[in-house]
Amino acid sequence: MRPPMRGGGGFRGRGGRDGGGGGRFGGGGGRFGGGGGRFGGGGGRFGGFRDEGPPSEVVEVATFVHACEGDAVTKLSQEKIPHFNAPIYLENKTQIGKVDEIFGPINESLFSIKMMEGIVATSYSPGDKFFIDPYKLLPLARFLPQPKGQSTGGRGGAGRGRGDSRGRGRGGSFSRGRGAPRGGRFPPRGGSRGSFRGRGRF
């Protein structure tokens, strides 16, 4: 499948830019707004795309949910968490963009993909699959509460950036980087009390 090329017009929803007042992805006050549990942002913006070449292997990481302001909002289909800014591919290893922000409950997380120039998020349909280099994934356990004296391992190396990861609440949470969330909320599902929030980079 070849990546779709840019067409005319951007995504627009009802009641504001994308279905809500003030929120980038449809809610009040937050970029991925809604009502309910806390969520957060991820790696922030990055300038340009560096061609790293296709990996030797790709695995499914997410399915398309909807487009918003040029980005693709996707639901994580992996048990592991992608690195911020990790390249995202089609099944044929054609790169279409990079991981931009991760948000939502830990057990049903979503992330947005910043599309490469010339590729349009609105050209994808719900359920379309996206892929990632398996070496760009981190174990979920790295973001859950750990007993004192224990640390989580797994591939991916130590976290890079200004933030840290620490569990909060019975379900655990992701807290990374510079300050609080941007004010939006995302409803948790499945009874999980954990969530992704904060800004930072792996």
Swiss-Prot record:
Main location: nucleus
This protein's record includes keyword Kinase: no
Highest rank taxon of the organism: Eukaryota
GO cellular component: chloroplast thylakoid membrane; nucleolus; ribonucleoprotein complex
Record text on subunit structure and interactions: Component of the small nucleolar ribonucleoprotein particle containing H/ACA-type snoRNAs (H/ACA snoRNPs).
Role of this protein: Required for ribosome biogenesis. Part of a complex which catalyzes pseudouridylation of rRNA. This involves the isomerization of uridine such that the ribose is subsequently attached to C5, instead of the normal N1. Pseudouridine ('psi') residues may serve to stabilize the conformation of rRNAs.
The protein's name in its UniProt record: Putative H/ACA ribonucleoprotein complex subunit 1-like protein 1
The species this protein was found in: Arabidopsis thaliana (Mouse-ear cress)
